[in-house]
């Protein structure tokens, strides 16, 4: 699937949610078990996901991906995800 700014944002969320655990497990042992290590691991996973998505880098897109990686099982995230139904990446990132 080729991802563009016109792609439905829920497709990108699904891609991120499905690939995050594997990337996390792959990189987990390469970072120390500290807050700094956890932050570095999160940055590495977000960077790998951005490469996988293959859109031009933007701070907003990186922040969006980081939010999905850090908060996947919260009520607030579920409500946020529900509010994105029918929107494109362009709608979410540039609004």
Where are these regions (language model features)?
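Amphipathic alpha-helical oligomerization segments
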Residues: 4-32, 51-79, 91
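Short basic-aromatic helix/loop recognition motifs at nucleic-acid
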Residues: 35-37
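Short, charge-rich amphipathic interface segments used for partner binding and complex assembly
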Residues: 39-49, 89
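Amphipathic alpha-helical binding modules
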Residues: 81-95
């Amino acid at each position: 699937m080729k991802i563009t700014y016109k792609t439905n944002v829920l497709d990108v969320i699904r891609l991120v949610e499905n690939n995050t655990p594997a990337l996390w497990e792959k990189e987990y042992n390469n970072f120390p078990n500290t807050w700094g290590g956890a932050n570095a691991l999160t940055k590495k996973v977000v960077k790998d996901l951005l490469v996988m998505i293959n859109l031009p880098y933007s701070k907003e897109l990186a922040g969006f991906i980081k939010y999905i990686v850090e908060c996947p099982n919260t009520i607030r995230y579920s409500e946020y995800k529900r509010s994105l139904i029918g929107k494109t990446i362009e709608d979410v990132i540039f609004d």
